[in-house]
């Protein structure tokens, strides 16, 4: 891992680290969203659907902004706490983030997902559970810092998904995009779309 993958926050304390969602994950999910939704306005026009294609375009843009906002998550670790934050332009009702002082961390518990994966939750002394972000660049470094701050053994904690999984998904997404583009261009050349 290169040192420029994890940004240090010079304006805060010397030891604060910022971990962002991996660019591979961000690009893959944004491309998948565009690829899956791009045909909808064209299909609405061809099938004479009761929903105008303009409304679909508007909904797609709103959805894209919402997805991008969710993918702007940042995990900040400093001497006092772990924090999950979002940029100021993201409304708090949509994604409000959380913070947990290191002194309040009681344990790190594993849970199985519906798909058979493993996720981890911080348990606070008050019984609240906070999801450990697992799709960040520098995950291993982040987990080492969590272990150093809490004393909880994190040697068995691994990322939820590996980069090759997102590379495969990105490859299939690009293939689907090519099929979408071919279908839309063919429909336009046949005069089915205006």
Which residue stretches match the model-derived regions?
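Short N-terminal micro-motifs specific to bacterial/archaeal maturation
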Residues: 41, 45, 58, 73, ...
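Short, exposed beta-strand/loop patches in secreted or surface proteins that constitute
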Residues: 9-11, 74-75, 121-123
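Juxtamembrane boundary at the C-terminal end of a transmembrane helix
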Residues: 178-194
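Non-transmembrane, membrane-adjacent beta-strand/coil modules in membrane-associated proteins
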Residues: 84-144
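Conserved beta-hairpin
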Residues: 60-101
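Hydrophobic alpha-helical transmembrane segments
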Residues: 26-28, 45-60, 194
């Amino acid at each position: 891992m290169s040192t420029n993958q994890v940004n240090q926050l010079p304006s805060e304390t010397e030891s604060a680290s910022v971990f962002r969602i991996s660019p591979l994950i961000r690009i893959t999910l944004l491309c998948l969203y565009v690829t899956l939704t791009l045909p909808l306005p064209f299909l609405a026009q061809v099938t004479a659907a009761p929903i105008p294609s303009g409304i679909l375009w508007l909904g797609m843009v709103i959805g894209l902004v919402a997805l991008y906002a969710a993918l702007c998550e940042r995990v900040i670790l400093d001497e006092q706490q772990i924090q999950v934050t979002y940029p100021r332009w993201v409304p708090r009702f949509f994604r409000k983030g959380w913070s947990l002082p290191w002194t309040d961390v009681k344990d790190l518990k594993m849970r199985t997902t519906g798909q058979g994966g493993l996720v981890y939750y911080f348990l606070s002394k008050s019984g609240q559970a906070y999801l450990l972000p697992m799709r960040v660049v520098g995950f291993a470094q982040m987990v080492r810092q969590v272990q150093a701050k809490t004393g909880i053994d994190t040697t068995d904690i691994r990322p939820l998904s590996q980069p090759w999984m997102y590379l495969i998904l990105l490859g299939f997404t690009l293939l689907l995009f090519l099929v979408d583009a071919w279908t839309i261009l063919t429909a336009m050349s046949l005069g089915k779309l205006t």
